[in-house]
Amino acid sequence: VAIDELGDLVIKTAAGVVTHRRPVARQTIEGLVQEIPARFQLSQTTPGMWQAGLDVGRYDATQKLVIDPVLVFSTFLGGSRDDQAFGIAVDAQGCVYVCGQTTSTDFPTAGTQRNQNSSGYDVFVSKFSPTGSNLIYSTYLGGNDNDRGFHLAVDASGCAVVVGQTFSINYPISKPFQANYGGGDRDGFITKLSPNGAALVFSSFVGGSGSDDLTCVAVDPVGNVYAGGNSSSTNFPVLKPFQAANRGNFDSVALKLTPEGAPVYATYLGGGGRYDSAVGITVNAVLLFVGLQYVTP
């Protein structure tokens, strides 16, 4: 743990570096806002052990003191119609990636893979500079029906991997492991964009003849891709499965791809309940899925 030259608190953990921005303190007295000096400080409790705290300047102890973190940036992102963000990720350089769905035909695009809404809801993927002052790229992804981006992750090269659901039989694909729409109500999709957002590294349908969604994704240090979701299909494209068959109405599904998009495994994960779905995924020394289950007593 350390305090850098900007006054930010920097904590190194096994999962990476966590930075807490220098705090800002204020009081409002008789309608006037007064800035109060505030900073992080470190104290050594025992040899090798440090404790972080706050050092606050003189203030009126009879009035409320507000201590806030610094807002790095905050911005609108959207067009003239319905825009919703569902997923966010940050890369090693601090660039921010956002995905979701939009019906706007004037959604802001820059450096795009696609610059026009196809129909209804399209997926959007946008990348911001670390300060939020520059929209590095922003693109639509979609076919002739509704498409939604639920989650994304970013690899070490700055490639965004997006997962979601598509109702479009012509969702854009490239080097797919499943080239055709599986049928049924909807399919999941998994799409990897180039670092500048202008090209598809790979993009594939993921689903069978029922309803399929991919809801979460993670990338390991060497670029392997892990995704999870749910499926009502009895013919979901399994490969080297832990569980080969759907055991309920909707089962969770999990899959792993190489950095180039080739499948390593795909499996059901579920019981006999009405609905199972993966809702979160992380990769460290082990692969961890979290999900939900609905069962009938």
List each model region and its residues.
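Residues that cap or anchor secondary-structure elements
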Residues: 1-80, 87-90
